[in-house]
């Protein structure tokens, strides 16, 4: 009640700092930054990853609209990947796509069908379930594709011993 009683309910201040520290500690992350919403968080992460107009970003077919809006805000194009039986991004199909439909050339990942650069992927841990990202993250790291986890629906969920998080 102290936060409400103090009259200091805002996007800044001591309670926001305490919240960020608590989330970082709880998830085992080095840092946590409170954002106004998931769309803003993904938008910022895509900008940091260097996504620009004309680039492509892989996203699941089943998701909240936030990742797709964030991609569109930058003038980039979503490349939709099918969902697995748990409604998450189908990792096997996504890896197959990266290996067979994307050419790695001069440090860029070129979609063979469109000729556009694939810059990032947004796996979404939907309905509290998690995606095993180990192999996908390894492939993306080797190719320089940013992996931006949307863990908005999975706070408190784990992949093995690790919490899901944004900021893979």
Where are these regions (language model features)?
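Nucleotide-sugar donor-binding loop of glycosyltransferases
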Residues: 55, 61-62, 82, 151, ...
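Short beta-strand->loop structural element characteristic of the AMP-binding/adenylate-forming
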Residues: 60, 77-86
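A short beta-strand submotif of the Rossmann-like class I SAM-dependent methyltransferase core
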Residues: 34, 59, 120-123
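N-terminal "arm"/small-domain region of PLP-dependent enzymes with the aminotransferase-like
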Residues: 1-9
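Phosphate-binding glycine-rich loop
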Residues: 9-56, 70-73, 80, 105-113
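Active-site phosphate-binding strand-loop segment of PLP-dependent enzymes
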Residues: 86-168
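Conserved coil-to-alpha-helix start sites within the AMP-binding
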Residues: 63-68
């Amino acid at each position: 009640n102290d936060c409400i009683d103090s009259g200091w309910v805002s996007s800044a201040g001591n309670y926001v700092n305490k919240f960020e520290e608590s989330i970082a500690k709880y998830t085992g992350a080095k840092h946590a930054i409170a954002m106004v919403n998931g769309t803003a968080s993904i938008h910022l992460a895509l900008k940091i990853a260097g996504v620009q107009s004309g680039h492509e970003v892989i996203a699941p077919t089943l998701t909240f609209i936030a990742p797709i809006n964030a991609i569109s805000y930058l003038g980039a194009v979503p490349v939709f990947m099918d969902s697995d039986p748990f409604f998450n991004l189908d990792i096997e199909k996504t890896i197959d796509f990266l290996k067979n439909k994307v050419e790695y050339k001069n440090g860029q990942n070129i979609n063979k069908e469109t000729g556009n650069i694939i810059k990032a992927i947004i796996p979404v841990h939907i309905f509290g379930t998690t995606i095993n990202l180990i192999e996908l993250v390894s492939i993306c790291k080797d190719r320089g594709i940013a992996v931006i986890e949307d863990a908005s629906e999975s706070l408190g969920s784990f992949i093995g011993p690790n919490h899901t998080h944004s900021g893979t």
